[in-house]
UniProtKB/Swiss-Prot annotation:
Region (Disordered): 13-72
Basic residues bias locations: 60-71
DNA-binding region residue numbers: 62-121
Phenotypic consequence of gene deletion: Plants missing both PDF2 and ATML1 have reduced levels of L1 box/ gibberellic acid (GA)-regulated putative targets, including LIP1, LIP2, LTP1, FDH and PDF1, in the presence of GA and during seed germination, thus leading to a delayed germination upon imbibition. In plants missing HDG3, HDG7, HDG11, PDF2 and ATML1, increased cell division leading to cell overproliferation.
Places the protein is found: Nucleus
Source species: Arabidopsis thaliana
Limits of the START domain: 253-484
Protein name stated in the entry: Homeobox-leucine zipper protein MERISTEM L1
InterPro entries per record: GLABRA2/ANL2/PDF2/ATML1-like, HD, Homeobox_CS, Homeodomain-like_sf, START-like_dom_sf, START_lipid-bd_dom
A GO CC term attached to the entry: nucleus
């Protein structure tokens, strides 16, 4: 039966605002004030069902009754709201029983609380938008004043628009197009300029050995290398002290930012043309290597960062390949400093984002602009690192085609000495079908490389040390590693193959941390928690030390790191296969002590059988010695190879293989970095023959072949690096005997390798 007062009754049931000041509590004021002070959380109806139960013929009470919730009820409701702001019927009934409230009282409390939070957020956002609008209006007024007071640079009189020649008109159109893009980026950057950086990257001078750097490890999700915690720091290892570049750069000033934006736009245009243009900019030589025509380059790009400084040598290379990763995830890797330094940990020894000028638009990185600094290395103590201070700019050019460019900001650095600078360098990424992408990489560097050891100069001059081929080869291998780690259809034909997804993920995460830790001690970087002790005479053994405390990923105590590089007249592939083979391990590994080495577990990491993670067991001939496990990762690509290993605890590895957390497994990695010597040019299908990057040029090919060198294609540059715990007490003093022992160990290993590979006189 229809009752005319029924809907009026329901209206009063939902109306929480007192109609007059004569309520039971004496609450006065407007609805908004009542909402602000009571927030619907402290005041509610005494019996919300009372009006529905009234006789429909009776008039509803005009005066509704309210009562306050107790302090305990409010605390419980607030606590539950933080966990679940939208409780279901079952949860509301449970709360009503616990707090002695009606279910509808609980329901209305949550409704009012959500409304209050929404209103507070809207007011806060409105205040921010109003502040930004005021800033834009003020900036617009400054521009108007500047235009009204503009003067002619020639005569000093008022500026006037006169007749333009045909060429001048075209220049003005081109300038207008570039200015439009600059204004668009500036408008985006205006929203973010001046925002404080994250706590762990707020200021360079404050970085020290006690500075906490979050660990980054492979998260095994497409496009998510490392824990993306939005940190602006990307370290392969911990930072110890300030290197030259850390002392010479700072966050750019407000006056510098318009110039940075303009430079980034010009660099993007240059990179796209460098990646897509052939002759006469890139000239092909007889051995299919492209040489950059510097005269044509400066004629084509008269703008940019200026002429080449005296004393610097140009390196330019270009390389293309197809990788098994979609373009969106590739862009994310390049624009996130943590993921970038993790994926390229063998090249990037340290990276920092100084300031994010723009985060992009439309929920992606289109238009993203950030000022960065990075240190690039070769896995050898004999090759100095290269430090750059640059801006990185990402732009979508068309549907499915993106570009990321770096260009140095040396003009903003107070340091008068420039040892290395990046002309527009980066990559074009083209979307392909089935989740693949085509990557065209351009590296254009000007560097003072006179400090490079003579043994490594041929490698550096071919472009394999820092050129585009090394970047592309590393990216291709890492994409294969990620794709292999995510495979679900693993055949169980081999008992040593790990088929459990959880076990594979944990073991790969542990291996990745081992590789990254190895890279901190193998190169010439000084930006990590190592103190260099000495380089011992003609043997060129670089010894460093560090104290490990409160780090679950490393054993506590004093750790020594020793590294040395030498040349052997053996092809890189033969050296790589010898060092990664467990059957030949006893020929060089003192830890195996002549025992039988057996592979217990295995994870393939790509097409090449040399790319894998293995768990080895050393069965010592001494019955009194317990068996030992060794975690090993071997990887190879067209630019070089690694064999990295570390002794691990048996109990801890059982936890890892069961899918447990690998971050608490203590590791001290040792291993080898194998590079071609740069002497072979062309033929043989070798890694160094296909380097394709000369002093001024680089090769281009759609496919990167794996290392397939033969004995006739030149020798190898082998770097051996050990990390050894010499004292389990972190506060103990380092003894000279410990240094001598580590030196003896590394020399003995080198001699064993030379003898096993028959390198007499090497």
């Amino acid at each position: 039966m229809y009752h005319p007062n029924m809907f009026e009754s329901h209206h009063h049931m939902f109306d929480m605002t007192p109609k007059n000041s004569e309520n039971d509590l004496g609450i006065t004021g407007s609805h908004e004030e009542d909402f602000e002070t009571k927030s619907g959380a402290e005041v509610t109806m005494e019996n919300p069902l009372e009006e529905e139960l009234q006789d429909p013929n009776q008039r509803p009470n005009k005066k509704k009754r309210y009562h306050r919730h107790t302090q305990r009820q409010i605390q419980e409701l607030e606590s539950f709201f933080k966990e679940c702001p939208h409780p279901d019927d079952k949860q509301r009934k449970e709360l009503s029983r616990e707090l002695s409230l009606e279910p509808l009282q609980v329901k209305f409390w949550f409704q009012n609380k959500r409304t209050q939070m929404k209103a507070q957020h809207e007011r806060h956002e409105n205040q921010i938008l109003k502040s930004e609008n005021d800033k834009l209006r003020a900036e617009n007024n400054r521009y108007k004043d500047a235009l009204s007071n503009a003067t002619c640079p020639n005569c000093g009189g008022p500026a006037a628009i006169g007749e333009m020649s045909f060429d001048e008109q075209h220049l003005r159109i081109e300038n207008a197009r570039l200015r439009e893009e600059i204004d668009r980026i500036s408008a985006i950057a205006a929203k973010y300029v001046g925002k404080p950086l994250m706590a762990n990257s707020s200021s360079f001078p404050q970085l020290s050995s006690s500075h906490h750097i979050p660990s980054r490890s492979l998260d095994l999700e497409v496009g998510n290398f490392g824990n993306n915690n939005n940190s602006h720091t990307g370290f392969v290892g911990e930072m110890f002290g300030s290197s030259d570049i850390l002392r010479s750069v700072s966050i750019p000033s407000e006056a510098d930012k318009p110039m940075i934006v303009e430079l980034a736009v010009a660099a993007m245009e240059e990179l796209v043309r460098m990646a897509q243009t052939g002759d006469p900019l890139w000239v092909s030589s007889d051995n299919s290597v492209e040489i950059l025509n510097e005269e044509e380059y400066f004629r084509t790009f008269p703008r940019g960062i200026g002429p080449k400084p005296i004393g610097l040598r140009s390196e330019a290379s270009r390389e293309s390949t197809v990788v098994i990763m979609n373009h969106i995830n590739l862009i994310e890797i390049l624009m996130d400093v943590n993921q970038w330094s993790s994926v390229f940990c063998g090249i990037v020894s340290r990276a920092l984002t100084l300031e994010v000028l723009s985060t992009g638009v439309a929920g992606n990185y289109n238009g993203a602009l950030q000022v960065m600094t990075a240190e690039f290395q070769v896995p050898s103590p004999l090759v100095p690192t290269r430090e750059n201070y640059f801006v990185r700019y990402c732009k979508q050019h068309s549907d499915g085609i993106w570009a990321v460019v770096d260009v140095s900001l040396d003009s903003l650095r107070p340091s008068p000495i420039t040892r290395s600078r990046r002309r527009p360098s980066g990559c074009l990424i083209q979307e392909l079908q089935n989740g693949y992408s085509k990557v065209t990489w351009v590296e254009h560097i000007e560097v003072d490389d006179r400090s490079v050891h003579n043994m490594y100069k041929p490698l550096v001059n071919t472009g394999l040390a820092f050129g585009a081929k090394r970047w592309v080869a590393t990216l291709d291998r890492q994409c294969e590693r990620l794709a292999s780690s995510m495979a679900s259809n693993i055949p169980a034909c081999d008992l040593s193959v790990i088929t459990s997804p959880e076990g594979r993920k944990s073991m790969l995460k542990l291996a990745e941390r081992m590789v990254m830790s190895f890279c901190t001690g193998v190169g010439a970087s000084t930006a990590h928690a190592w103190t260099t002790l000495s380089t011992t005479g003609s043997d060129d053994v670089r010894v460093m030390t560090r104290k490990s405390m409160d780090d679950p990923g490393r054993p506590p105590g004093i750790v020594l790191s020793a590294a040395t590089s030498f040349w052997i007249p053996v092809a890189p592939k033969r050296v790589f296969d010898f060092l990664r083979d467990e059957n030949s391990r006893s020929e060089w590994d003192i830890l195996s002590n002549g025992g039988l080495v057996q592979e217990m577990a295995h994870i393939a990491n790509g097409r090449d059988p040399g790319n894998s993670v293995s768990l080895l067991r050393v069965n010592s001939g001494n019955s009194g010695q317990s068996n030992m496990l060794i975690l090993q990762e071997s990887c190879t690509d067209a630019s070089g190879s690694y064999v990295i290993y570390a002794p691990v605890d048996i109990i801890a590895m059982n936890v890892v293989l069961s899918g447990g957390d690998p971050d608490y497994v203590a590791l001290l990695p040792s291993g080898f970095a194998i590079l071609p010597d740069g002497s072979a040019r062309g033929g043989g299908g070798s890694a160094n023959a296909s380097a394709g990057a000369g002093v001024e040029g680089g090769g281009e090919g759609n496919n990167l072949e794996v290392v397939t060198t033969t004995g006739s294609c030149g020798g190898s540059l082998l770097t051996v690096a050990f990390q050894i715990l010499v004292d389990s007490v972190p506060t103990a003093k380092l003894s000279l005997g410990s240094v001598a022992t580590v030196n003896s160990l590394i020399k003995c290993t080198v001699e064993r390798i030379k003898a096993a590979l028959a390198c007499d006189g090497a």
